[in-house]
Amino acid sequence: MKARAGGSAASGGGRPEALAALRAAGGRVDEFTTPPVGHEGPRVPPLAARGRLALTRDELAAWGERFGRAAHAPLVVTLAGDLGAGKTTLAQAICRGYGVTEAVTSPTYALVHQYASPRGPVYHLDLYRLEDPRELENLGWDDVTTAHALVLVEWPERAAGRLPAGHVPIDLEHAEGDAERRVLLAG
């Protein structure tokens, strides 16, 4: 799994909130950058800094739960990666951390699932089957991505430039061996 965080405050889920969520979720986020000259010890990286983690499926789930606990709506999180990279696994974990108690399933055929949480609604979208970004209108894209909610978007590249500013992109990939995912935190 590769994880990237970035964006601006324009969507309400801006950089400070995204960084705070990543710091709380990652636990080791501050290990990803070399401290500047004259600075003692590790520092929390700016969103433009890069870092990688290799996580097992269980570690990915634990990381996702911590991320969900730290997340604050409104927040749009995109989950990109090949089939089987762990997008739905991570979405399930984020939802658990956010307080969703019902089973979270892949919205591949329904395209969007809505879940209730004591902290507010969660929308989980899977854009894999979209053939044209104009189809987003049929999903209520503008309403969902501007709602005071946690929004998880799988296959965000199908949104072709329609992602809100300030979203948190997380890219997932298989690492060496099938048991691990790579995490990349970058701006």
Question: Where is each model-derived feature located?
Answer:
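Phosphate-binding P-loop
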Residues: R69-P74
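P-loop (Walker A) phosphate-binding loop of NTP-binding proteins
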Residues: D82
